[in-house]
Curated annotation (Swiss-Prot):
Bilayer disposition of the protein: Multi-pass membrane protein
Keywords: Cell inner membrane, Cell membrane, Lipid transport, Membrane, Transmembrane, Transmembrane helix, Transport
Protein name (Swiss-Prot/TrEMBL): Lysophospholipid transporter LplT
UniProt xrefs under InterPro entries: LysoPLipid__transptr_LplT, MFS, MFS_trans_sf
Family indicated by similarity: Belongs to the major facilitator superfamily. LplT (TC 2.A.1.42) family.
Transmembrane intervals: 18-38, 53-73, 91-111, 145-165, 167-187, 227-247, 257-277, 281-301, 305-325, 344-364, 367-387
GO CC terms in record: plasma membrane
Superkingdom, taxonomy of origin: Bacteria
Subcellular location, record wording: Cell inner membrane
Cytoplasmic side: 39-52, 112-144, 188-226, 278-280, 326-343, 388-397
GO molecular function: lysophospholipid:sodium symporter activity
Topological region Periplasmic: 1-17, 74-90, 166, 248-256, 302-304, 365-366
One record GO biological process: phospholipid translocation
Length: 397
């Protein structure tokens, strides 16, 4: 598999299939590991406000390595970068299994994830082009969300049975992702021979940030995806505390089932976006973004399981329809200006900065004793207002 190959632009080429399988297994491990590690924190009597800290150390790795991972993705064959990154995730999951501090192990998984993300999205533009890129993003998002669906549930269910079994399953998933990466064709590096001087790399990354921010379309995409993923991660942790308060259920599995409803909805929304939205009609996704916040607000007031399931699925549908076109827009415009790997690295910086900020505010709210239902109401209202403001700004510019 070491030879270079010409790109086969089919959506179902051998390389694309390998990317999708590797992405599924890697994302499965990510999501199962989150809920397995949360169960470990509960079992070891960590305070409730420490739960979002777990995700904050994960996204902190993204932010710390943001200036460098884009160049890594563009300087080497992206399939090999993905394999190395999944190896780091495997090491992190295994370290938690063997009793190393879960925050340290999860940080290592975050380093692997930071290296993985620019490569996994950047390779799509090398395996397919043009009008197929939105569809390729739809496949990637669908496989990711299917992994979120199954991984989240598996992590919670296995953790209710035995936490160590859940952690071992995560390590096994990462091992499978490493194997799948072997079957991704070794495409030529997008931008080989770049300087590895850390100061120059940081300066180059900041230049990429500036270039993308000055372009109205890429700035619009960066802000939209950052708000979405920041809110999405915060919602996952809100559910962990909301379920016992609103529904009176205290197991590890129920929050994962509710997260699964969001995942199912995103698959549906991503498919709809691939059919109904093009790079020229991206603004069609904006009403869906506003509705996410409105439905989160309504959801926070529920006390029955069935309405909660339905509303979370609706949130997912709106989310998939909202984020897939924005991702495709950034990849297409970014590939032409700063390179796909750098564009995704800048996107990761924005998204993870938003996650860090939102999780920090959420953790602080929990720490000072604000009830989870008012937190959810305020969270939904602020998100709807933020997307409304973004849409108004986009229409004016």
């Amino acid at each position: 598999m070491s030879e270079s190959v010409h790109t086969n632009t089919s959506l179902w080429s051998k390389g694309m299939k390998a990317v999708i399988v590797a992405q599924f297994l890697s994302a499965f491990g990510d999501n199962a590991l989150l809920f397995a590690t949360l169960a470990l924190l509960k079992a070891q009597f960590y305070p409730e406000w420490s739960q979002p800290i777990l995700q904050m150390v994960f996204v902190g790795a993204y932010i710390l390595f943001a200036p460098f991972v884009g160049q890594v993705a563009d300087s080497f064959a992206k399939g090999r970068v993905m394999m190395f990154a999944n190896g780091l995730k495997l090491l992190g999951a295994a370290s938690i299994c063997f009793g190393i501090n879960p925050f340290l192990g999860y940080t290592l998984v975050g380093v692997g994830a930071a290296a993985y993300s620019p490569a996994k999205y950047g390779i799509l533009g090398e395996l397919t082009t043009g009008s197929k890129l939105v569809k390729a993003n739809g496949l990637m998002e669908a496989s990711t969300i299917a992994a979120i669906l199954l991984g989240s549930v598996a992590g919670g269910v296995l953790a209710d049975w035995h936490v160590l079994v859940a952690l071992a399953a995560c390590a096994l998933a990462y091992g499978g992702a490493v194997v799948a990466n072997i079957y991704i064709p070794k495409l030529a590096a997008a931008r080989p021979g770049q300087s590895w001087n850390l100061i120059n790399m940081t300066r180059s990354f900041l230049n990429a940030c500036t270039s993308l921010w000055r372009n109205g379309e890429t700035r619009f995409s960066l802000v939209g995806t950052s708000l979405f993923w920041g809110a999405g991660v915060t919602l996952r942790f809100l559910l962990v505390l909301w379920v016992p308060v609103a529904l009176g259920i205290t197991d590890n599995a129920t929050p994962t089932y509710l997260n699964a409803m969001v995942a199912i909805g995103i698959v549906v929304g991503a498919g709809a976006a691939a059919k109904l939205v093009t790079l020229e009609t991206v603004s069609r996704c904006m009403p869906a973004g506003i509705l996410i916040g409105v439905v989160v607000l309504i959801f926070s007031l529920q006390h029955e399981l069935l309405p909660a399931y339905a509303l979370l699925m609706l949130i997912g549908v709106m989310g998939g329809f909202f984020v897939v076109p924005l991702n495709a827009l950034l990849q297409e415009r970014g590939k032409k200006s700063v390179g796909a790997g750098n564009a995704i690295a800048v996107q990761n910086l924005g998204e993870n900065s938003a996650m860090l900020l939102m999780l920090g505010i959420y953790s602080l709210a929990v720490m000072i004793g604000i009830p989870v239902v008012p937190i959810g109401i305020g969270f939904g209202a602020l998100f709807a207002l933020a997307i409304t403001a973004l849409w108004i700004w986009q229409r004016r510019h």
